[in-house]
Regions:
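Short terminal targeting/anchoring segments
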Residues: 210-212, 418-438
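Terminal intrinsically disordered/low-complexity segments used for targeting and assembly
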Residues: 2-72, 148, 232-278, 320, ...
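A short glycine-centered flexible hinge/capping loop motif at secondary-structure junctions
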Residues: 204-208, 412-416, 453-457
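Small/polar, glycine/serine/threonine/aspartate-rich low-complexity segments that form flexible
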Residues: 37-45, 49-58, 68, 107-129, ...
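Transmembrane beta-barrel architecture of outer-membrane proteins
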Residues: 65, 79, 123-125, 171, ...
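Sec/SRP-type N-terminal targeting helices
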Residues: 79, 95-96, 134-162, 212, ...
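Periplasmic alpha-helical coiled-coil/stalk elements that build and connect Gram-negative outer-membrane
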Residues: 19, 140, 156-272, 383, ...
């Protein structure tokens, strides 16, 4: 074939892959450029923030062991991983339409008359067929690109599940510690109340107390037993939640009291840029979805233009296998085909409108994800200082209550106050100890939330 005859095919191939998709531009972030870190502790002079791996952030070795186990066995993470594999296969399936398709075939037939001349007629044939869509206007290219972005979005979704799992396992473990510590305090308080009851009962025998004080002492004992039963149920539920996250029902680690040194504090630069949110997998997933919607506009635009496909083949046919591949038995064909959209009652325009509206929806979704992420970080930053102040005040209040209880007991022994004063001091001390535990747990959870909101938890 002469070069002149090859030229049209070269031009066609050069044009293949042109795209009508709009140029992608990342939307501006609809949030302030920096987070407000005024009056916030743990601010350093670093120029930027770097996420620590979760093995560094979590100091407690037991937490690290549980997270490692969950990353292997958790069903939600397995499902997310399988969805990534499915999306990858779907992308390969869609992308295959952009390339030539080559198929071979072969057949044989035997026929004859039932009566008369009963000679058998034989016919053998082979063929090789090729087809290719000349993607002049990028319909297939943009469809493939949209599927690729969907696949990458699924990968980001899997990362988000990974990060959430790391956070949930740590929070569930600390919740187990909290439930155990609350149970320990309730049991210790019950023992103190029982000692007080024995003391009041002894005073009643000597006439130094009365039946009312004894009944009051018995009442707080029963109330504390009820609280113990409640705490036991909470501990069992915390264990069940942890086992579900781990994806296995083996022996859990022995619950321990809350340890404030189980994780590092998130240290932040003085000028923390909101650009750090762009590394969060949920925001990256939303941007991938936006890119896919952008590519779908290109595919919808291409539907307004002609589509050309080429089909060709070679075949042979013979009544004898020995001569099947002789040149004299061969044939060839070449079938170019063009389809021009003329009238479809507005179908193509409707498809384009849908693609453009979905692209606008993806922009709104992307912006909303950023705003939600900004709020998560801002909330965690605001709560950090508040919790520190609450804990400091609660610790001072606890110290004051301990002194109050000691004095109330001394005054009661000398008959200066009623037993009700002692009960009030004991109940206040009991409630304050529980509140302090809750606040320490809330501070740990808030630090984990801040770490996760800034995109931490993916790297080890």
């Amino acid at each position: 074939m002469s070069p002149c005859k090859l030229l049209p095919f070269c031009v066609a191939l050069a044009l293949t892959g042109c795209s009508l998709a709009p140029d992608y531009q990342r939307p501006a972030m609809p949030v302030p450029q920096q987070f407000s870190l005024s009056q916030n502790g743990l601010v350093n002079a670093a120029d930027n923030y770097q996420n620590a791996g979760w093995r560094t952030f979590f100091v407690d070795n037991q937490v690290k062991t549980l997270i490692s186990e969950a990353l292997v066995n958790n069903r939600d993470l397995r499902m997310a991983t399988l969805k990534v594999q499915e999306a990858r296969a779907q992308y390969r399936l869609t992308d295959a339409d952009r390339y030539p398709q080559l198929n071979g075939e072969g057949s044989g037939s035997w026929s004859g008359n039932l009566k008369g001349n009963t000679a058998t007629t034989r016919e053998f044939s082979t063929g090789l067929n090729a087809s290719f869509d000349l993607d002049f206007f990028g319909r297939l290219k943009n469809t493939s690109e949209a599927e690729r972005q969907n696949y990458l979005a699924t990968e980001e979704a899997q990362r988000a599940v990974h990060i959430l799992l790391v956070s949930n396992v740590a929070q569930s473990y600390f919740n187990q510690q909290l439930a155990y510590a609350q149970l320990q305090i309730a049991e210790e308080t019950l023992r103190n109340y029982q000692q007080s009851y024995a003391f009041v009962e002894k005073q009643l025998l000597t006439g130094s107390s009365n039946v009312l004080a004894l009944e009051q002492a018995r009442g707080v004992i029963e109330s504390t037993r009820s609280d113990i039963a409640k705490r036991q149920g909470e501990l069992a539920q915390a264990n069940n939640a942890l086992q579900l996250l781990l994806g296995s029902y083996g022996k859990l680690p022995q619950a321990q009291t809350v340890n404030s040194d189980s994780l590092q504090s998130v240290k932040l630069p003085a000028g923390l840029s909101s650009q750090i949110l762009l590394q969060r997998p949920d925001i990256m997933e939303a941007e991938r979805a936006l890119m896919a919607a952008n590519a779908n506009i290109g595919a919808a635009r291409a539907a307004f233009f002609p589509s050309i496909s080429l089909t060709s083949g070679i075949s042979t046919a013979s009544s004898d296998l020995s001569s099947l591949f002789n040149a004299s038995s061969g044939m060839w064909n070449f079938i170019p085909k063009i389809e021009i959209p003329i009238f479809n009652a507005g179908r193509n325009q409707a498809n384009l409108d849908i693609a453009e509206i979905r692209q606008q929806q993806s922009v709104v979704n992307y912006e909303q994800k950023i705003q939600n992420a900004f709020k998560e970080v801002a909330d965690a930053l605001a709560l950090r200082q508040s919790l520190n102040d609450q804990i400091s005040a609660q610790q001072r209040y606890l110290a004051s209550l301990q002194i109050t209880l000691q004095r109330a007991r001394a005054l009661y022994q000398h008959g200066a106050v009623s037993y009700l004063e002692v009960l009030d001091a004991e109940r206040s001390l009991f409630a304050t100890r529980q509140t302090l535990l809750d606040l320490n747990y809330a501070r740990q959870v808030n630090e984990i939330s801040l770490y996760t909101a800034l995109g931490g938890g993916w790297q080890q």
